[in-house]
């Protein structure tokens, strides 16, 4: 049970945070009404406002794992990494795109050491084969819905071409990396609402403190029969005398309700016991997932010096984090994992000295890699739970009702 002291401290922190938010909102509203600041500024501040008020799994006293988190407990705790979303919610359209930028410069000219692993291949992602073959990432990573992969691929390719043009470089072959989940239960996916304009907005919105929940590529996803979305988490590990960060971002769209585990608790079974009869309610029509199908895209970023082979070993442990939340990887589920490190860049031929025929890498010894394994598993588990805790309830295209994990936990109060 959570102690009275802990609950009191958490309450005091929440009150102080609310007071700070109140002062900020008054100033922000005044400036907006007076027309002092531009549209881009308002959009940025509104995003910050939403981030400040979003609930995450730790706000309910649930602390997954035992390794300390990064400053924000997000993938962007890895220096240089940024995330941007564009969300489209209009009528039957409930979808979006999310971009993960590995660093501030042109990745095509100075690729990142990378790895890709497919646990169960029910999916339509692009760009994985070249990552597996060469061990490098040369573009930002984009996430969207299944039927928009091609359109988003084209937009990412155009983004890289413009970067190369500005850098005075020629790009004749590009490997855009695009992952996907099928959001057709909530989104009219056949309308293919995401194009170049939405991808540009996601790039323009990229920052270090991204929103979670039903935003961007997570706008229309379902996880364990509840509303899913985008979630992120990070862990800090020590190798030698130096600390390194491992961050994870997920697009969650998988799992059967009955299987949901929250920090070791069989919450899914309890949800069905408490709310299961709502499925027959002609008004509420609460939806639950009976099978483990759908997908989860998992992106891991780190500044840990590793080879692409070591990185493959690390991202395979993301599957352990998925299993900790209860899933067993069903036939119709696609688990795709992509990882990159900012530590070992692989400059293209044009940026290398002509006489430089050998490449020197720094890599951790294998006997220290267990720390990274555990960090990856913990961050994945928490990222999934954050994707659900930050998402609100919604209705599907057939009128069915998808509950929010946050609402369920709020009704229970403290669960530990």
Descriptions of predicted regions:
Residues 7-10, 35:
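Intrinsic, low-complexity polybasic segments
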Residues 52-416:
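Alpha/propeptide regions of enzymes that mature by internal proteolysis
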């Amino acid at each position: 049970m959570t102690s009275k002291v802990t609950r009191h401290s958490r309450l005091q922190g929440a009150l102080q945070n609310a007071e700070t938010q109140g002062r900020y909102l008054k100033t922000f509203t005044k400036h907006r009404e007076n027309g002092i600041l531009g549209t881009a500024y308002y959009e940025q501040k509104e995003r910050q406002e939403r981030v400040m008020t979003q609930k995450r799994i730790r706000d309910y006293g649930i602390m997954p794992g035992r390794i300390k988190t990064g400053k924000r407990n997000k993938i962007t705790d890895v220096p240089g990494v940024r995330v941007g979303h564009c969300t489209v919610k209009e009528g039957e359209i409930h979808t979006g795109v999310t971009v993960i930028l590995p660093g501030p410069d042109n990745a095509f000219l100075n690729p990142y050491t990378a790895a890709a692993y497919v646990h169960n291949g029910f999916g339509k992602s692009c760009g994985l084969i070249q990552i597996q073959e060469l061990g490098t990432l040369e573009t930002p990573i984009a996430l969207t819905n299944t039927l928009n992969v091609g359109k988003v691929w084209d937009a990412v390719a155009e983004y890289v071409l413009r970067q190369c043009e500005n850098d005075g470089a020629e790009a004749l072959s590009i490997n855009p990396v695009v992952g996907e989940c099928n959001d057709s239960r909530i989104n009219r996916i056949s309308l293919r609402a995401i194009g170049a304009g939405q991808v540009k907005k996601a790039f323009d919105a990229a920052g270090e403190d991204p929103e979670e929940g039903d935003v961007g590529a997570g706008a229309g996803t379902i996880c364990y029969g509840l509303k899913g979305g985008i979630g992120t988490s990070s862990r800090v590990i020590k190798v030698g005398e130096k600390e390194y960060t491992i961050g994870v971002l997920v697009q969650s769209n998988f799992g059967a309700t009955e299987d949901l585990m929250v920090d070791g608790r069989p919450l899914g079974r309890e949800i069905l016991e408490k709310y299961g009869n709502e499925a027959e309610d002609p008004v509420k029509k609460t939806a639950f997932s009976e099978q483990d199908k759908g997908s989860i895209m998992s992106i891991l970023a780190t500044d840990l010096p590793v080879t692409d082979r070591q990185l493959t070993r690390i991202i395979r442990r993301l599957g352990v984090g998925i299993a900790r939340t209860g899933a067993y990887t069903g036939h119709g589920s696609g688990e795709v994992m992509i990882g990159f490190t900012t530590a070992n860049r692989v400059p293209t031929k044009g940026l290398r000295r002509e006489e430089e025929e050998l490449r020197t890498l720094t890599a951790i010894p294998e006997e220290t890699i267990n720390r990274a394994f555990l960090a990856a598993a913990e961050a994945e588990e928490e990222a999934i739970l954050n994707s659900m805790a930050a998402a609100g309830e919604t209705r599907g295209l057939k009128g069915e009702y998808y509950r929010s994990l946050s609402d369920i936990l709020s009704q229970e109060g403290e669960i530990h």
